[in-house]
Curated annotation (Swiss-Prot):
Classification via InterPro entries: ArgE/DapE_CS, Bact_exopeptidase_dim_dom, Pept_M20_carboxypep, Pept_M20A, Peptidase_M20, Peptidase_M20_dimer
Protein name: Putative carboxypeptidase YOL153C
Cofactor (UniProt): Zn(2+)
EC nos: 3.4.17.-
Coiled coil residues, start to end: none
GO cellular component, one term: membrane
Top-level taxon in the UniProt lineage: Eukaryota
Organism: Saccharomyces cerevisiae (strain ATCC 204508 / S288c)
PROSITE patterns assigned: ARGE_DAPE_CPG2_1, ARGE_DAPE_CPG2_2
Length: 581
């Protein structure tokens, strides 16, 4: 039976406070949709067609990037079936294809579910599809609807004293642009399976109906095998992640927090990176354990308008343009600390791959003990556009408005600056930097300056510049890549790929590291529930496949999809068998 809960909408983001006026009393100068580090590293490494000789630098005899201890579940009744049975794979493809054919598209602005249920009709169809496709899940698990559309599945364990495992995914997908529908190799809502390439095509195939179906199917198979979990297993499915999760995860997370309390989950698994094949034999699984922060700053130049035949030295558009020019030409400093998760990935690549130039490998491996090499490493990362933004705060002017008529001076020009906040910085530090440059321009041109309600420079006869921060999110807490919880997670990944999926590739080497997202997932609302949050989909994802997310020809390997099913199956069992709180 499904229960429905009408939960209130909480505040905008967790752990983000509106900056106070005292924060800004002194101004200081600080000198791709969701992008995972694996995609970025592959973009660089794939530019080399053959290994680079390493005669000028020897890899240390005792590598720091080591294979984790393998965790094998003793209950593995269906692992071989999931990975190798043709009929299971056909059925799994059919289930994923059916979900793709239900267009649960979400826009940037959406009505509340209670206000316009018809708007969400496809989501209700998806819920019905789940009931029909996963009958054991719906007969054995408690199913609750939070804010009408958020789905919460609870598989009660036999020992309520143990922390639950929490899996996440989202039901929604980004809209398909109807104007370029014909650009798709197969119709975007077809869920077409091409046996020759082993690809399932369609919107949501890789973001992230694949993960959602893998979680449901893994649990369904455990139930079919008669498995009884000792530890409670929870599946939380939002419905508006692609528009920041304001009505889905933002309501589901506090609902869980109220029920279970803070730090109540053993671990949280959500969408993220997978395995990257760096060369013929080397695979790196980068479970994203950190995300950058976020803040938009709305900047407005307030003038007095008038007829354009009586022009000032600079219109509000001109002042805004100069401020934008100053900000774009004074980017945030690079800050490559060795505790940045991307260093772990680079370290694995340097120790075990032959594709990096010797001087780069040396810089990576000697960075912990050599300040000069650390500088070389920073310069290397800063010189590659695909990597550099993971070691600094970014600033992009994305929206601008000003002027209404050719012969009328613009009384108001405003623009929005989007920032992705470095994991070693903060929202306050980021906004202070914008405020510094606004003050430079205000003083140069004789304008006043305000931040929210605080008057920094009184308004002048020309007008004033105003700043306001919006949608603030601090960088995510970095989840540990050591300790008991991580060891079970990494050991499950290691066993699944090293000993099962790649078992016939005798010289294959798999390593598991942390990773970093420059974007944000629904996990931003779940920080209070666990310190162990890993954003990971257990599949091998080629670079060309990842590039299709949110784009034309989104697709996924069916083999990668069933490997994700196997991971869910094994991970639940392993945490039950080896986990302790």
């Amino acid at each position: 039976m499904t229960e429905t809960h009408h939960a209130p909408l909480p505040d905008v983001y967790p752990s983000s406070k509106q900056p106070t006026s005292s924060t800004y009393s002194k101004c200081k100068k600080f000198g791709l949709p969701l992008i995972g580090l694996l995609t970025l590293l592959l973009a660089y490494i794939s530019s080399f067609t053959k290994p680079v000789p390493n005669s000028t630098f020897d890899v240390p005899a005792s590598p720091q990037c080591k294979k984790p201890q393998v965790y094998r579940p003793s209950f593995n009744k269906s692992v071989n079936l999931i990975l190798n049975d043709k009929q299971f794979k056909i059925d799994s493809i059919r289930k994923l294809s059916g979900a793709i054919q239900i267009p649960t598209e979400i826009s940037d602005t959406n009505p509340l579910p209670n206000d316009d249920p018809e708007y969400y009709s496809e989501f209700f169809k998806l819920h019905k599809y789940f009931e029909e496709t996963f009958p054991l899940v719906h007969s054995h698990l408690k199913v609750e609807k939070v804010n009408q559309l958020g789905l919460l599945y609870t598989w009660e364990g036999t020992d309520p004293s143990l922390k639950p495992i929490l899996f996440m995914a989202h039901q929604d997908v980004v809209p398909v642009n109807r104007e370029i529908w014909d650009s798709w190799q197969y119709p975007p809502l077809s869920g077409h399976y091409d046996q020759e390439t082993d690809y399932v095509w369609g919107r949501g195939s890789n973001d992230c109906k694949n993960l959602m179906l893998a979680e449901l199917e893994g649990i369904e198979q455990l139930l079919a095998d008669g498995y009884q979990t000792e530890r409670t297993v929870i599946l939380s499915l939002g419905f508006d992640e692609e528009s920041s999760g304001f009505m889905g995860a933002k309501v589901l997370a506090p609902f869980l927090l109220e029920r279970y309390g803070p730090d109540s989950m053993f671990s949280i698994i959500d969408e993220g990176a997978g395995l990257l094949r760096l060369d013929k034999n080397l695979y790196i699984a980068a479970a994203v354990n950190a995300e950058k922060g976020y803040v938009d700053v709305r900047i407005s130049i307030h003038g007095h308008g008038g007829h354009s035949s009586v022009q000032p030295d600079h219109t509000t558009i001109g002042v805004a343009s100069e401020l934008i020019y100053m900000m774009e030409n004074h980017p945030f400093d690079y800050n490559f600390s060795l505790d940045n998760p991307i260093y772990d990935v680079l370290q694995c690549a340097a120790e075990h791959s032959g594709f990096l130039p010797p001087h780069v490998r040396e810089a990576i491996l000697k960075a912990p003990v050599d300040e000069g090499k650390r500088k070389v490493l920073t310069e290397f990362a800063a010189s590659h556009p695909d990597i550099r933004d993971l070691i600094r705060t970014t600033r992009a002017v994305d929206v601008i408005n000003g002027g209404v008529k050719a012969n009328a001076l613009p009384g108001l020009t405003s623009f929005i600056v989007n920032h992705r906040v470095d994991i070693h910085s903060s929202v306050n530090e980021t906004v202070e930097n914008d405020l510094y440059w606004a003050r430079v321009i205000a003083e140069k041109h004789g304008y006043g300056l305000t931040f929210h309600d605080e008057i920094i420079i009184p308004e002048t006869k020309l007008g004033h510049i105003s700043l306001a921060s919006e949608k603030m999110l601090e960088p995510a807490p970095v989840s540990p890549t050591s300790g008991h919880v991580w060891e079970i997670f990494a050991g499950t990944v290691q066993n699944l790929f090293q000993n099962e999926i790649l078992a016939e590739q005798k010289d294959a080497d798999v390593y598991v590291t942390g990773g970093l997202f420059s974007g944000n997932t629904d996990t931003k609302y779940y920080w209070g529930l666990s310190k162990n949050i890993y954003r990971f989909v257990a599949g091998i994802f080629p670079f060309d496949q990842l590039r299709t997310i949110h784009s034309v020809n989104e697709h996924i390997s069916a083999s990668s999809h069933v490997s994700a099913v196997a991971f869910v199956y094994e991970y639940i069992v392993n945490v039950n068998e080896y986990g302790h709180d």
